[in-house]
Design a protein with these regions (language model features):
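Polybasic/polar functional segments that serve as interface/processing modules
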Residues: 1-116
Length: 116
């Protein structure tokens, strides 16, 4: 289970990654590309090359957790364009991003299909 609080440290990896990578592969990306230690408890957000899915990697002191969000339709509308390997996010910005919104404008995308 992933618990996000306003105090959570969340980092967005700005370059897309191969989503065949699992926990160990994404932890290696944290160390080599993002140049961070994934064992320090931060949440790392990765995007696939197509821009249709996100993976969240977190270490909670007992083990890794990996979450996947794949859109049913379309692509994520917001992604930072920067030379930095990582961008910090707040928990609120991450929730907006997961709902395919734009954290910079705080607008939510329309639901593709209502959940009953």
């Amino acid at each position: 289970m992933l618990q996000l609080t306003p105090q959570s440290r969340i980092f967005l990896a700005t370059h897309p990654v191969d989503f065949r990578k699992g926990i160990d592969g994404l932890a290696a990306v944290c160390r080599q590309v993002v140049q961070d230690n994934p064992l320090e408890g931060a949440v790392y957000v990765f995007r696939n090359r197509a821009g249709t899915a996100l993976k969240l990697l977190v270490y909670d002191g007992q083990g890794y957790g990996l979450c996947l969000k794949r859109l049913s339709q379309g692509r994520f509308t917001w992604w930072p364009t920067t030379a930095n390997a990582r961008v910090p996010l707040s928990a609120r910005e991450l929730m907006i991003l997961l709902w395919n919104g734009d954290p910079e404008r705080a607008q939510m995308a329309q639901d593709w299909r209502r959940v009953a």
